[in-house]
Structure formats: C-alpha cells, structure tokens
C-alpha cells in the first residue's frame, strides 16, 4: 500500500514522502496513529494544500519534545528485582516498569515511547531508548539489581556477576605442583610430613 507520511518515520522517510508499506502496517499503525494518509489523488491534494501547516505543527511538537528530553539527559533509574545467583531475573522488566520508574522521578513518558526490543531478564546496566517524537529521543540507563547496595556498585562500574564468579572460583583453588609425581607430597608441605609420620608411629 502507498501512503503519504505526515511525519518522519524511522526507516521509511520524511514528511510528504510517498512510500510503499505492507497493508497491515498501514492499517494497524500508520493510519490510526495519523502518521500517514493513503496515497490517493484526493489525499495528495489535501496534503499539498495543508503542507505548510502540517510541517509547522510537527516543528512545534518537536520543540516541545526537545524541552521534555532535557529531563532525560544522563538519566538513570534503578529497579530492584529478585534474581538467581546467575543474575537471571525471576520475571522481567517491561516498558511499563520503566515508565513507572520515570514517573516516580516526575518524568512522564508514554509506554509506546519506550523502545524495548525485548524484556530485560538479567541484572546489570541496560540502555533503553526513550522516543518523545519521531525526531527526538534519549537513552536512559536502567540499573537492575537485587539490592540497593548492588545497584550502587553497578552504578560505579562494578561487574557484580563477574566478581561473584571470581570469588566462587577462588574458593576452590588448591595448591598444585606441576612437577610432582602421583602420590608425592608437594615441596611446600614436606616440612609438615615428619610431624604427621611421628604422630602415626606414636
């Protein structure tokens, strides 16, 4: 289906562009959200007659979005969630969770403006795009942790999961002499051997 774009649409085009899209995308998204018109002769004439006003309205919305976007500059939110020892969440973080977290800080964004390819399912720092207008967006850091203390460490750049695994591995390290024969006492332990033998003889 051919449509006339009424605003910039990512990966499609700019205001006034006539583009070909799948019928379902046009009917379910572009047309009901007034982002485009069917590209018939009547609509082309209507668009050209109102083009200046359409572009002015878009510029006004873009300006408002730029103002709102200032509150998102270098913005981060923290979400405390239960998770396994491997960092997998018991559940997930959705767009709604991010909207609510921003609202608690006095920042209102539409759920549709949270660009989340898939739900967040692990602890850590995640970058999420917030779209306020077709031409205005910001990136927000979402700090997902199991406790406020863990969130603070992550905000300082600490890889909590990596440190946890390092501690676990350190707990299982043993003294190892690559030159020792099977059954041979390591050199550093030989001083203790006579005492052990004496005890056995006694």
Curated annotation (Swiss-Prot):
SUPFAM superfamilies reported for this sequence: L9 N-domain-like, Ribosomal protein L9 C-domain
One cellular component (GO) term of this entry: ribonucleoprotein complex
GO biological process: translation
Region annotated Disordered, chain positions: 168-202
Record GO terms (molecular function): rRNA binding; structural constituent of ribosome
Top-level division of the source organism's lineage: Bacteria
Biased composition (Low complexity): 192-202
Pfam families attached to this UniProt entry: Ribosomal_L9_C, Ribosomal_L9_N
Assigned keywords, A-Z: Ribonucleoprotein, Ribosomal protein, RNA-binding, rRNA-binding
Keyword rRNA-binding: yes
Membrane as UniProt keyword: no
Gene3D superfamilies for the chain: Ribosomal protein L9, C-terminal domain, Ribosomal protein L9, N-terminal domain
Task of the protein: Binds to the 23S rRNA.
Similarity remark: Belongs to the bacterial ribosomal protein bL9 family.
HAMAP family membership: Ribosomal_bL9 (MF_00503)
Protein name in the entry: Large ribosomal subunit protein bL9
Species this protein is from: Rhizorhabdus wittichii (strain DSM 6014 / CCUG 31198 / JCM 15750 / NBRC 105917 / EY 4224 / RW1)
